């Protein structure tokens, strides 16, 4: 009974709760960083130096009345944000930090499959809101997410060819001597830009184009359901940055001190997250045709050529005698 309780309740909670706390502080860091980049203070009233601002925001959102538009689809309208958060939490299961909740042989494929399902929560929320702005935002989000998943999948395939396995733990072994960032630097740059687009972050935040769509697919949401979407979005940002760290920045595993690996991953993830915020502060929003041009006419041909190169080169050199 205790084993079942530990494996089915305590272990997942021990993973999910720190992620949600990290999300709360990421929102605060974002507001502070953007504030200082725009030569202002950011939140500085709640708690010492504004540290409790995200707690106050969370309490405020969850005690408000969740208002539902009268013409909205009642079941789907409330199910979509819950589905978004559940999928965002499930994505953390195969992450080696240093030990995963689910030790999967195909951990990378699991992450790709579940992140693809997140499209349904966005599409469901946009359609169920019965608002033209929400629907346009949802359709943009779906087109953008599906487009950039193509390049993400091909980049992952190249990285898998280098590491020799679909488990995330094999990447730790592969990168004991050299980070994959060095041999795969063109793919790493494209991966980073694709993760920005995949998580709908600036400069690819066309789904939330305030100037034309008010707030995008979540325009009709308020209170708790809006907070769930918010948590899911920022959890996905942290997840993508953790994934980038494991793939390209060598989360070195030392069996004697696994805590060092957790600290290493957390530090690199935090630095990548601040790079996300820096991008938001620095670049204006892309036009929609530029967004699609970038993936289908630039990233897709380059990633396809590099995948074929990484497959062909080992096969071509396989017949050579061992070099002593």
Swiss-Prot record:
Top-level class of the enzyme under EC nomenclature: translocase
GO molecular function annotations of the record: NADH dehydrogenase (ubiquinone) activity
Compartments in which it is found: Mitochondrion inner membrane
Transmembrane residue ranges: 9-29, 75-95, 106-126, 146-166, 178-198, 212-232, 259-279, 299-319
Any Pfam family the entry gives: NADHdh
Keywords noted in UniProt: Electron transport, Membrane, Mitochondrion, Mitochondrion inner membrane, NAD, Respiratory chain, Translocase, Transmembrane, Transmembrane helix, Transport, Ubiquinone
Catalysis performed (reactions): a ubiquinone + NADH + 5 H(+)(in) = a ubiquinol + NAD(+) + 4 H(+)(out)
A single cellular component GO annotation: respiratory chain complex I
Top-level taxon of origin: Eukaryota
EC number: 7.1.1.2
Subunit structure, as described in the record: Core subunit of respiratory chain NADH dehydrogenase (Complex I) which is composed of 45 different subunits.
PANTHER family named in the record: NADH DEHYDROGENASE SUBUNIT 1 (PTHR11432), NADH-UBIQUINONE OXIDOREDUCTASE CHAIN 1 (PTHR11432:SF3)
Function: Core subunit of the mitochondrial membrane respiratory chain NADH dehydrogenase (Complex I) which catalyzes electron transfer from NADH through the respiratory chain, using ubiquinone as an electron acceptor. Essential for the catalytic activity and assembly of complex I.
Family recorded in the similarity comment: Belongs to the complex I subunit 1 family.
Name assigned to this protein: NADH-ubiquinone oxidoreductase chain 1
